[in-house]
């Protein structure tokens, strides 16, 4: 609010209130780290192939590790191809390590020469995510143009961009989560349950199990603007 009080400093207009300011309250909140909860997920941002004489056979996969740690020797699966391999090296800047912790930006090498591209995801073979072409989500709508069934958007999920269609809108959710109301569209700043159909499978976890791999944004195909944010159920 433009003229809001008790946000940073105590308000003279609220002498009856002896609690914390909004800022003091926010600074005292404790939240779980988004990087350190769940199963190891490694969305590939880029493939590194120097093509120099010294590193003529180097093939590394760079990205940020979410959810949990990964170690040299771990059996891994590349999605969506479901190709299996093992981690042989983990690079961080100019050094190699036996293990990388969640939140690290690293480059990893795999045992065999396989096809991996940006948008793929490397996971432990024992911890596969869900792989589906339809997702049930909670969407917070941020566009002045209403969200209605049948419209197409790009789902940007980690480094993977997938063309998708809004299959249905079930309801809107009160901002205090006190209840729901049946709805067929979402207006700006509304939150609702939305089913989305994807043009190709998405590899994901529920948001409450892995925040980084359970969240996405919806991008308008015409304007390339971010129209909404979503959380997979």
Task: Describe each region flagged by the PLM.
Residues 1-39, 43, 48:
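Canonical P-loop GTPase G-domain recognition
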